A protein has these predicted regions:
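Conserved mid-domain beta->alpha element of the FAD-binding
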Residues: 13-41, 163-164, 189, 219, ...
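C-terminal auxiliary extensions adjacent to catalytic cores
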Residues: 375-400
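Active-site substrate-recognition segment that forms the wall
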Residues: 205-240, 249, 253-257, 278
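A short coil-to-beta-strand element that immediately follows conserved catalytic motifs
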Residues: 183-186, 202-206, 227, 261-277
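Residues at the starts of beta-strands that form the adenosine-phosphate
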Residues: 10, 33, 227
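Short helix-loop capping/hinge motifs at secondary-structure junctions, enriched
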Residues: 67, 195-202, 239, 262, ...
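Acidic/histidine metal-binding catalytic segments
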Residues: 71-74, 130, 257-272, 331-336
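Conserved N-terminal helical subregion
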Residues: 2-11, 28, 53-175, 179-194, ...
Length: 400
């Protein structure tokens, strides 16, 4: 841990989601106090399950909550891809002992609320993190000694620096960058189904995906296998805006009429759906603006096709902490090192996720090519292809 900073001012964090609370933990571990400004009336995560690769566990260990989170996770035996049209096996990636030896950490699935709770408990246990809810960041001003944040109630908050971790619709990014989100036209429906209602022949201990033309389905166990997360994605026929709302069973069924009955039955199970119209942004080279820096979805929102959104936010948090350890109380150099260490990697994730969406949703001849390319591929070949993503650690996170 770095020496305790001389100033009694906190670092301000806009956003109390996974990235914001992870950043709070990382900063406290470097001797800072933190004030989190969250717009929602209470902290929490919208959504259901989330997949965690080895890089996520490396980040959690660096934040000091690895064991706490491991106790809440479900460890899969494999990742499995089937063709949703004919049920054929496209590819299988074992995530057992050989996978763990290769990447020094497991592959797991966990409820978003459980990972957020682990982070929040870790932050609260430090006694150095203050959380203000119902606080909407409106404007940021800077001077040579720090930042002043103005919220929608007219209250000002003073800090050494500001971390903008306020999501896809980031107010901090809007002030400093001013770009628009790129609405993908892809819609995601998410639901949780109790084990007793889930088809027995699909109760696999795996992160399973069924890929189809302009659509795919994902399912995996949660919370000790007592629940199953069901996620379906399709290309919308309508003009979409980035949004989250209640889903329509009739709508989601209408997009999966051509897939095989075995996969389609999954869509008929949930009683309640949450609907996301997804968006990302074009990668940018500048995340740092004086004493303000972007993090997580505010910096690099990504589509879900690599299951890396939350993982990247936690990597950001750890890297930010490490940069401040190297350049203690030197904001210019610390923030520059943080930015230099993260921009290319996260841009690769954003662009790779777009391409993976195309592969998942291939149709016609492209579908045949996809299936042929992955057919019979050995675990080692898959692992080699994943090394750039899953090989990240707190020890190798800095660019120099």
């Amino acid at each position: 841990m770095a020496n305790t900073p001389a100033s009694s001012l906190p670092i301000l964090i806009a956003g109390g989601g996974i990235g914001g609370v992870a950043a709070a933990l990382a900063l406290v571990r470097q001797g800072f106090t933190v004030k989190v400004l969250e717009q929602a009336p209470q902290l929490g995560e919208i959504g259901a399950g989330i997949q965690f690769g080895p890089n996520a566990f490396a980040a959690l260990d660096a934040l000091g909550i690895g064991e706490k989170t491991r106790a809440r996770a479900v460890y899969t035996d494999e990742m499995v891809m089937h063709d949703a049209l004919d049920e054929s096996l496209v590819g299988r990636i074992p995530t057992g002992e050989a996978f763990r030896r290769r990447f020094n950490n497991p592959y797991a699935v966990i409820h978003r609320a459980d990972i957020h709770l682990s982070l929040l408990e870790g932050a609260q246990e430090t006694g150095q993190v203050e959380v203000l809810t119902s606080t909407n960041v409106q404007k940021v001003e800077q001077d040579t000694k720090g930042v002043t944040v103005f919220d929608s109630k007219g209250v000002t908050h003073r800090g050494l620096a500001l971390i903008g971790a306020d999501g896809v619709k980031s107010a901090v990014r809007a002030q400093y960058v001013g770009d628009d989100a790129r609405v993908s036209g892809h819609v995601v429906y998410r639901a949780v189904v109790e084990k007793k209602e889930f088809p027995v022949d699909l109760q696999w201990n795996a992160a399973s995906i069924w890929v189809g033309p302009n659509c795919h389905l994902v399912h995996y166990p949660l919370r000790g296998g007592e629940q199953y997360n069901v996620v379906v994605t399709f290309h919308s026929r309508d003009q979409e805006d980035w949004s989250v709302r209640e889903g329509s069973r009739q709508e989601v069924l209408s997009y999966f009429e051509v897939i095989c009955p075995r996969a389609r039955q999954l869509i008929e199970l949930p009683k309640d759906w949450k609907r996301w119209a997804t968006a990302d942004r074009e990668p940018i080279a500048q995340w740092v603006f004086g004493r303000a820096a972007l993090l997580g979805d505010a910096a690099h929102p990504t589509l879900q096709y690599l299951a890396q959104g939350a993982c990247m936010a936690m990597e950001d948090a750890v890297t930010l902490g490490e940069a401040l350890r190297v350049h203690s109380n030197d904001w210019d150099h610390a923030f520059a090192l943080y930015q230099r260490s993260r921009v290319a990697r996260t841009a690769r994730v954003v662009l790779s996720a777009r391409e993976m969406g195309r592969i998942f949703h291939a149709k016609g001849v492209e579908r045949l090519v996809r299936n042929d390319l992955w057919k019979g591929r050995t675990p080692e070949r898959y692992y080699d292809a994943m090394e750039w993503l899953y090989g990240w650690t707190a020890q190798n996170c800095l660019a120099d």
